[in-house]
Each structure stands twice: as structure tokens, then as C-alpha cells.
Amino acid sequence: MNKFLNLVMRYITADQIFSGKGFFPSHTVLVLDDMNTISDITTLDSIEKSNVEHFKGIITPGFINTHCHLELSHLKNVIKQHTGIVDFGLSVIKNRNNQSPEAQLEAMRQADREMREQGIVAVGDISNTNVSIEAKKQSDLFYHTFVELIALNPERADLVFDVGKRLLSEFSKAQLSASLAPHAPYSASLELIKKISEDCSTLNKPTSIHNQESNAENDFFNSKSGDYLRLYDTINVPIDYFKATGKSSLQAIISSFNSKINTLLVHNTFTNKDDIENAQKTHSHLYWCLCPNANLYIENTLPDIALLHSTNCQLTIGTDSLASNSQLSIIDEINIILKYQLTISVELLLQAATYNGAQFLGIENKFGLIEKNRNSGINLIEGTSGNYSVKKLA
């Protein structure tokens, strides 16, 4: 019997235990203290079996949601599905201030509680304003906020960057982790991307960008054609200065990022092999975020996840916002992938949902792994492949 056995400790095991990088040997037991820190990792034969809680399913570290928009939580069930990205974006612009500040804050608090209940422990969250600060300060979750900037006109890069830095300082004053991020290739000039990326490099913080969420984005960069012309016409923003590049959006913008900082490419729904290979040659710290529920909600299609995996992309998982999703649940995103892309393994997706996400956010020393002397959250996944559910054990 383990000589350290006492009533304060909790001993848990399951059919499988996933560390964040792979599965532990069978009969592994996690020893938790009264603060849910892992004080030891041992085996069944070293413990009095009557003291061990045995669960059916898979134990994992707490999940990392690398892409969310908490400040859009009040738009749940407001925007129609399958409209395409341009009409979705126009609907967000039209409706994002349709509720009182108090109602928006309560929606954010509810979304935060939902994520916690779904086993999420850390979030990479997009913010265009300061409205999420209060909800984040009160949360048990770790948030890294990406203060998102928009300006396709290169002449506006300095002004928008300065406004972004002032907003960034509000999060910093609230003692919330944050850095700048460009919105998307079609809405951020190369000049703005460069300024943001260099600022993140100076601060040693990650950045993020929505990437190839629609094929219209590639049309816009390749030949200055497609649905984004309608977007800019509708919002009455002239884009005479923008010139076609003859390239996909990703190939046109990737060299503007500092290749030494962690950079998240979000969605990648219309990313092909040439795009991936070009990006990987150019940038050595790329992560590729999957948000399948949002992809189905907006464009009704999914990225080629098998291609991303076969080309050694570092995958992470995000929920996107409640404007484009019915719930903020990493396990539900995993279920969607397992249902539609049968060659993808559970192990790959669990690493994407835990260690990879933590590594991207630069919090892998605290989150994303089951290791001795850590308190990274403990989840239990129950059910069968494609129909999993999750509950928090610690």
C-alpha cells in the first residue's frame, strides 16, 4: 500500500487517461490533493483498490478553446445559418449593439459559465472593444484576449494601431493577458499586420488571424473579384487602393508576420496544399485552429482536416462565437470532426484540444498536460466516438 495514502487525497483512474500528448499505460492512477493538484501519478497495484475511483471513459486535461468571441454572446440564435461569410458579417455589424450593455454582460457571463461546465479552462478570445473585461475579471477561466484590429487601407495602419494599443492597455490594467491581432486578410493591410506582429514580438505574445474562411477571400486576393466587393460596397468603404495579387490570401499575407511568434490561423476552410506548404516555409511558429461548427453554420462546409494533419500542421480547436454556434463546447467540435472526417483519430484531436492550444497561448507550463505538481483541470469524456460528452472531475 502507498505509504502516502490518506483521506485528503483522491485517487482516480479511467479506461484511458490522456496526458495532453498521448495515452498513459493502462492501470495508471492520478493522485489529487485537496486543491486538485496532481501530487503523484502511480499504478493500481501500489494503491488500496477500495480507495480508487474508476471511471468509464477517457480522462483528459482541461480543454483549451483557442478561438472565441465572448463579446458576441448576445447574438445567439440571431443570425441565420448558411448565409455565407459576407452576409454573416453584415448581420453581425447590424445586430452587435441590439441589446443593452447589461444584457450583453449577462450573456457573456452565461457563456463563460457554459465553457467552464464543458471542461474548458483557458480561452483565446477575440475582442474589438472593452466590453468583455468585467466578465473576464470575474471568471475562473484563464483568458488571453486578442485585441482585434481592422483597416485594409494602409494609410490607416498607424491610426488603427494606436487605437488598438490604447485598448490593449485597458486589458493590461485589468491584469488580463492580451495582445493585438489583425482581423483577416481582407480587412487588414500588410502594413497593419506587420505593426501588430512586431508589437507581439516585442511583448513575446501570440497573435491570431481569421484565414480563408470562404473562397471569396481567395478570389479577392487573386483577382479582386467575388463577394467581398459586395461587402465593401454595402458598407460604403472604397477600396480603390487594393490591388489583386495573383495569389491566395494566405500566400499574399503570410510573410508580413514575424515568423518567431506563435501565430494562429483560424478556420482554414478553403486552404489547399500549396497554401500550407508556402506558409510553413515562411513561418516556423504556425498553429491551425479548427472551428467546425462555425464553418457549417456560416459556409456549410468543413476544412480538409486530413490534409492539415498529413502536412504536419499544429492543430488547435476553437468554438468561435455564439453568433455562429449553438454552444461553446470543445467536445462538440471534436464530435463534429469525428462524424465528418473518419480518418482523424481521437488522440490527435485531444492533443489539439489540450497541449497544442496551451502551447500556442504560451501557457503550456500551467495548462494542457496531466503531470505531477500540476492543476490543469481534469475532464472525463464519456460515450462513444462522435457522440462524446464531457464532465469536469477536478
What are these regions (language model features)?
Residues 1-47, 58, 363:
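N-terminal metal-binding scaffold of metallo-dependent hydrolase/deaminase domains
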Residues 31, 58-59, 76-140, 162-173:
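Alpha-helical scaffold segments that flank or form the walls of functional sites
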Residues 61-73, 206-215:
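Histidine-centered catalytic micro-motifs
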Residues 64-66, 123-124, 143-147, 178-182, ...:
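Hydrophobic faces of well-ordered beta-strands that scaffold small-molecule active sites
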Residues 74-106, 140, 144-147, 215-260, ...:
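Active-site gating loops and adjacent loop-to-helix segments of metal-dependent hydrolytic enzymes
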Residues 125, 181-195, 211, 267-270, ...:
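Active-site glycine- and acidic-residue-rich loops that bind
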Residues 163-206:
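Active-site gating/metal-coordination segments in enzymes
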Residues 229, 256-258, 291-292, 301-383:
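His/Asp/Glu-enriched, well-ordered alpha-helical/loop segment
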